[in-house]
A protein has these predicted regions:
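Extended, histidine- and acidic-residue-enriched regions that form the cofactor-binding/catalytic faces
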Residues: 1-217
């Protein structure tokens, strides 16, 4: 029952010095390293999340924004297919907007809801209506405590959890994300194009691969 990993991300403007795929590249590069140490299946990455145009408009900046309500049916169909294959240990990882992961942001919320809906539909199809109320499920809460809950078959996680974020300069295209890219994907960084015109990029000059390594570790 190897873990099946789905890298989730967006294409979003990250200043002039970082690749627009930064949020996704951070996830895929971390998973590349994890794959050397653990038995996992990595699915092709999904780049087209709900980036929004909060940072910058799309013209000349490369941001691609797919609304969450469009992501939901796609994600539900994808998860349904993975369940039909037989996977029961599916994990999505996302970096975009995860400083608000506990409350949720459009992309991760869409995939979380899709996971629940896909599991509900799968269980009802496989076990019939009333499956949870059946006498066979009398030990549901005991099994849930033992991590046998079917709603754990698909989970979505932040690349950096809350504890890691407290220890790392989490930001958008500043020291933190630029450092992550210097460590994980240096070809996606061009400090020769750096501009301090935007407030969110100004700390990028302080970035280093060593700081990025601390975030990855």
């Amino acid at each position: 029952n190897w873990p099946v990993i789905l890298p989730l991300g967006v294409l979003e403007y990250h200043g002039e010095h970082l690749a627009v795929g930064m949020d996704t590249l951070a996830v895929t590069r971390v998973l590349d390293r994890l794959e050397r140490e653990a038995d996992i299946v990595i699915l092709p990455p999904f780049y087209y999340g709900a980036s929004s145009h909060a940072v910058a408009g799309p013209v000349g900046n490369g941001t691609v924004d797919v609304p969450a309500d469009r992501l939901l049916p796609f994600a539900q169909s994808l998860f349904a297919s993975l369940l039909k294959i037989g996977f029961r240990n599916v994990h999505g990882f996302i970096h975009h907007q995860t400083e608000n992961f506990a409350a949720g942001m459009p992309t991760d919320l869409a995939f979380k809801l899709a996971a629940r809906q896909a599991i509900f539909a799968f269980l009802e199809q496989e076990r019939g209506e009333g499956w949870w109320g059946d006498e066979k499920m009398a030990d549901y809460y005991a099994k849930q405590a033992e991590s046998a809950d079917p709603f754990n078959w698909i989970q979505v996680h932040p690349l950096l959890n809350a504890a890691a974020i407290k220890q790392f300069p989490f930001d958008h295209a500043g020291e933190g994300e630029t450092s992550l890219m210097l460590e994980l994907c240096p070809e996606g960084v061009d400090m020769g194009r750096f501009s301090a015109k935007q407030w969110f990029t100004r700390t990028a000059k302080q970035a280093s691969a060593a700081t990025g390594r601390r975030g990855v570790d």
